[in-house]
Amino acid sequence: MASVVVKTIWQSKEIHEAGDPPAGVESRAQLVPEAPGGVTSPAKGITKKKKAVSFHGVEPRMSHEPMHWCLNLKRSSACTNVSLLNLAAMEPDSSGTDSTTEDSGPLALPGPPASPTTPWAPEDPDITELLSGVNSGLVRAKDSITSLKEKTTRVNQHVQTLQSECSVLSENLERRRQEAEELEGYCSQLKGPRPDVLTQENCRKVTRSVEDAEIKTNVLKQNSALLEEKLRYLQQQLQDETPRRQEAELQELEQKLEAGLSRHGLGPTTPIQGCSGPPGSPEEPPRPRGLPSNGWGMAIRAGEGPSLSEQELQKVSSGLEELRREVSSLAARWHQEEGAVQEALRLLGGLGGRLDGFLGQWERAQREQAQSARGLQELRGRADELCTMVERSAVSVASLRSELEALGPVKPILEELGRQLQNSRRGPDHVLNLDRPAQGPCPRCASQGQQLSTESLQQLLERALTPLVDEVKQKGLAPACPSCQRLHKKILELERQALAKHVRAEALSSTLRLAQDEAVRAKNLLLTDKMKPEEKVATLDYMHLKMCSLHDQLSHLPLEGSTGAMGGGSTGGAPPKRGGPGSEQ
């Protein structure tokens, strides 16, 4: 199975190698020289220069191979900290001082350990703490990488913005240069063979324009220089900040790993001797490249630490492989969740737009509902006014009927008047007969108690007045006495009043029927609740028109009632007037 173990790479100016070579040749990558006599002394004066920590793949040795481990350290040319740790192959020595080149070197370990110690137990609770620390370190490293990516993206965007501004400024500079050249050409044309006052003024204007253009060009150059300097500063800051952040995170993770492994006795038991320096200076002792004094990496390189069993190494490797898979799955899940969040934000934006539209429609519906409520309130008020008008018209009709009933005794009075006119034509001897009906109540008037309708009253008036009118027209004689004139005027007035009463009664009865029908229809419409807004508006318009027409029709009802009352008063005063001429005669 593929196993992965966390290793530390210490990067400095050189990469040193530790361990005994297989052929007995002393390796130049040893860190501490061996003391004579086989006695080892602890390493002293080792200076640390830590750069970064990265995660590397480790391949376990085959079952048929001896315990000669080979440590292969590589560094990419892009200054990244990702390397492969090959423990199964040997590679030739190579070292370099440049940080942008690849460094590699073999590192061998002796097979049997110097002092075997008890391997760590699988059930040790510190393994869980170690794995949790590794997991938290991986999460923090992932967070730092994510933050660095975001900052790099922002800086790149800012750099692109500055580049676009620089390009715009360069275009403006080129344009100003062309304008200056054109102005110089125009100025040279103006300085022709006839330099008069106008030409000199134009030359001065052109000179001022050229000076202004030069000033603007200088300002643009200064701005461009400032922008370029700012761009370089941002790039330098980005390049300086990224390694520092990675170095701090990886150093913290390495310290936790070393602390966890040192508790299990994996530290070095014997110091390690160094070997010759780099190829450039063979006499100078090599400087350790940030190796910890009690770290796991030094124990492995020196080969003096206890060897772990195959099963424990496989467990640790499988656990770290699972951690790596979990980190990758977490990263993939984070990207998926980010996409889901973006989609949710887009959906929320669309929902917000729809909600704004719905709120606008709801406000319009509320305004329309308020208008409908006001219209219904006005309709109720007008219906109440219509009911009061109908009541007034009913009262007017009742008074008119009472007045018409009071006109019942008109027929005997007219007959008596006709007889008196005939007697007045016969001679003055019959004048005294007119006083007789005035002395007491008329027997016909006393016996006449029945009620006459409007049609019968009209017929009686026509039969009573027609012979008198015909006789007056035929003779063409003016009445001789004042009593005849008064009687004639009273007859004409009674005829006009009777006709007016009849017409008014017919109009009032028809108007009353219409008003009752419209009132019933208005009440039915008001009782109808389940109506659409459009139907309510149409119904309100229709009711408004109908109410206006009814108001116009019923506006004359109080006037007609008062007229009827006046007519009744005049009619009630007719019998006393009838006795007046008799007394005068």
UniProtKB/Swiss-Prot annotation:
Phosphorylated on serine residue(s) by STK22A/TSSK1 and STK22B/TSSK2. Residues 91-126, 262-309, 559-585 are annotated as: Disordered. One of its GO terms (molecular function) is protein kinase binding. It is found in: Cytoplasm, Cytoskeleton, Microtubule organizing center, Centrosome, Centriole. Residues 91-108 have a biased composition (Low complexity). The modification Phosphoserine is found at S224, S281, S309. Pfam families: TSKS. GO terms for cellular component: centriole; cytoplasm. The keyword Cytoplasm applies. Keywords: Cytoplasm, Cytoskeleton, Phosphoprotein. May play a role in testicular physiology, most probably in the process of spermatogenesis or spermatid development. This is Testis-specific serine kinase substrate. It comes from Rattus norvegicus. The lineage of its organism: Eukaryota, Metazoa, Chordata, Craniata, Vertebrata.
